[in-house]
């Protein structure tokens, strides 16, 4: 049996843009994608820490070193530039894979630069 597990997340990302008149998706700095092990067109969940909104979309790679986190299309109605979000990727793992899987947690600062890389999310609140 396969179960769904978090594979990686970008924690405390700051929304830089919200573009309502785009087809859809989230644009993320490609350096951040590499750090988190996320890929273009991968399905992700977005959690807005400012208003509690949760949504799903897919990734479009953004310009490297730009720090871009841009919600596009209808998702732009649920975020504002400056909002803090968590971007979570999930994967289907077998029981055996799940026992050895270590998710990547990339903690960002307010400029969307990598502040900390965590091999496994600690059992405490990250401030």
Curated annotation (Swiss-Prot):
UniProt record similarity statement: Belongs to the PanD family.
Keyword list, A-Z: Autocatalytic cleavage, Cytoplasm, Decarboxylase, Lyase, Pantothenate biosynthesis, Pyruvate, Schiff base, Zymogen
Modified residues (Pyruvic acid (Ser)): 25
Compartment(s): Cytoplasm
Cofactor dependency: pyruvate
The enzyme's E.C. designation: 4.1.1.11
Gene: panD
UniProt protein name: Aspartate 1-decarboxylase
Comment on bound cofactor: Binds 1 pyruvoyl group covalently per subunit.
Biological pathway: Cofactor biosynthesis; (R)-pantothenate biosynthesis; beta-alanine from L-aspartate: step 1/1
Active site: 25 (schiff-base intermediate with substrate), 58 (proton donor)
GO biological process, one term: pantothenate biosynthetic process
Coiled-coil residue spans: none
Organism: Bacillus pumilus (strain SAFR-032)
Record: residues binding substrate: 57, 73-75
PANTHER family linked to this entry: ASPARTATE 1-DECARBOXYLASE (PTHR21012:SF0)
Top EC class, one word: lyase
GO cellular component terms given for this protein: cytosol
Quaternary state and interactors: Heterooctamer of four alpha and four beta subunits.
GO molecular function terms noted in the UniProt entry: aspartate 1-decarboxylase activity
Modified how: Is synthesized initially as an inactive proenzyme, which is activated by self-cleavage at a specific serine bond to produce a beta-subunit with a hydroxyl group at its C-terminus and an alpha-subunit with a pyruvoyl group at its N-terminus.
Function according to Swiss-Prot or TrEMBL: Catalyzes the pyruvoyl-dependent decarboxylation of aspartate to produce beta-alanine.
